[in-house]
């Protein structure tokens, strides 16, 4: 009995489906038949049209297929006929009907929830770098007031000039300290020596005497000579004068006098 009921239901569903497909153009019929065969892809068990027809992707796929492959056809009519085909197959969402010979029955259709996944790409944060002149010795300045922007009116006689003033921020002076040390040393040595006669009045062979000698010949062929020495005192020489020139002068004078005596 049950087998005959199942066969009857299957035959009735096939006849209804054929009727529904006949009401659609050939292009949209192909889309509907294609979507009715995607139960496994959509996660529905075989011979469970209720799961397939209640799946959102069944309707979306039927709509997209008709739009892309069958331009000009009424997409909403194709979707409506697709849902009608599901109902004729016994896949109306939430209900099923038994064979009319055994009465009515109730059943539930189960659907698998779908989950969508997406990805969001967030741009990595960027970093920038810059440089500004740093205050010396660790000092820093801080803003202490801001002059807001506004007009500036300048009156000169009958002339009135209005200009705009930008906002200005005033900063404190750079605070900090500067310290440093400088050290150095300079050493040197030198000697200076001068030589010269000391300003004394002592008689010496340098300051007062100069030997002189003369030689002469006698008429008899003999030879003789005399050597005299003289000494004299004079004023002490100054640092810019030496005593040797004076002594030499005195010696020359003595020699000339001796020659004069011999000539007599």
UniProtKB/Swiss-Prot annotation:
GO cellular component: extracellular region; plasma membrane; side of membrane
Compositional bias ranges of the Low complexity kind: 94-139, 172-215
Bilayer topology annotation: Lipid-anchor; GPI-anchor
Post-translational modification: The GPI-anchor is attached to the protein in the endoplasmic reticulum and serves to target the protein to the cell surface. There, the glucosamine-inositol phospholipid moiety is cleaved off and the GPI-modified mannoprotein is covalently attached via its lipidless GPI glycan remnant to the 1,6-beta-glucan of the outer cell wall layer.
UniProt GO MF annotations: metal ion binding
Composition skew (Gly residues), residue ranges: 216-233
TM spans (from-to): none
Disulfide bonds: 27-70, 31-65, 44-51, 53-86
Signal peptide annotation: 1-22
Pfam families registered for this protein in UniProt: CFEM (PF05730)
Lipid attachment, kind GPI-anchor amidated serine: 240
Coiled coil: none
Domain CFEM: 23-112
This protein's UniProt keywords: Cell membrane, Cell wall, Disulfide bond, Glycoprotein, GPI-anchor, Heme, Iron, Lipoprotein, Membrane, Metal-binding, Secreted, Signal
Region (Disordered), start-end ranges: 86-160, 172-248
Compartments, record wording: Secreted; Secreted, Cell wall; Cell membrane
Residue numbers binding heme: 48
Maturation propeptide residues: 241-264
Family, similarity comment: Belongs to the RBT5 family.
Note on domains (UniProt): The CFEM domain is involved in heme-binding and contains 8 cysteines and is found in proteins from several pathogenic fungi, including both human and plant pathogens. The CFEM domain adopts a novel helical-basket fold that consists of six alpha-helices, and is uniquely stabilized by four disulfide bonds formed by its 8 signature cysteines.
PANTHER family in the record: CFEM DOMAIN PROTEIN (AFU_ORTHOLOGUE AFUA_6G14090)
Protein purpose: GPI-anchored cell wall protein involved in stabilizing the cell wall.
Annotated protein name in UniProt: GPI-anchored hemophore ARB_01545
């Amino acid at each position: 009995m049950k087998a005959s009921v199942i066969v009857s239901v299957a035959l009735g569903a096939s006849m209804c489906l054929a009727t529904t497909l006949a009401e659609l153009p050939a292009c949209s019929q192909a889309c509907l038949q294609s979507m009715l065969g995607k139960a496994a892809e959509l996660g529905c068990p075989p011979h469970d049209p209720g799961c397939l027809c209640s799946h959102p992707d069944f309707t979306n796929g039927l709509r997209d297929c008709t739009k892309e492959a069958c331009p000009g056809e009424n997409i909403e009519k194709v979707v409506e006929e697709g849902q009608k085909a599901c109902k004729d197959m016994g896949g109306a969402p939430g209900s099923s009907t038994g064979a009319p010979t055994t009465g009515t029955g109730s059943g539930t259709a189960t659907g698998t929830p779908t989950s969508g996944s997406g990805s969001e790409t967030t741009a990595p944060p960027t970093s920038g770098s810059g440089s500004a002149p740093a205050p010396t010795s660790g000092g820093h300045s801080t803003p202490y007031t801001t002059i807001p922007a506004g007009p500036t009116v300048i009156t000169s006689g009958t002339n009135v000039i209005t200009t705009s003033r930008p906002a200005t921020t005033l900063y404190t002076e750079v605070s900090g300290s500067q310290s440093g040390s400088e050290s150095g040393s300079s050493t040197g040595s030198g000697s200076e020596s001068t030589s010269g006669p000391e300003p004394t009045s002592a008689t010496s062979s340098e300051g007062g005497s100069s030997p002189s000698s003369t030689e002469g010949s006698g008429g008899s062929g003999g030879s003789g000579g005399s050597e005299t020495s003289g000494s004299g005192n004079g004023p002490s020489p100054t640092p810019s004068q030496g005593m040797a020139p004076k002594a030499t002068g005195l010696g020359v004078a003595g020699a000339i006098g001796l020659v004069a005596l011999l000539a007599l």
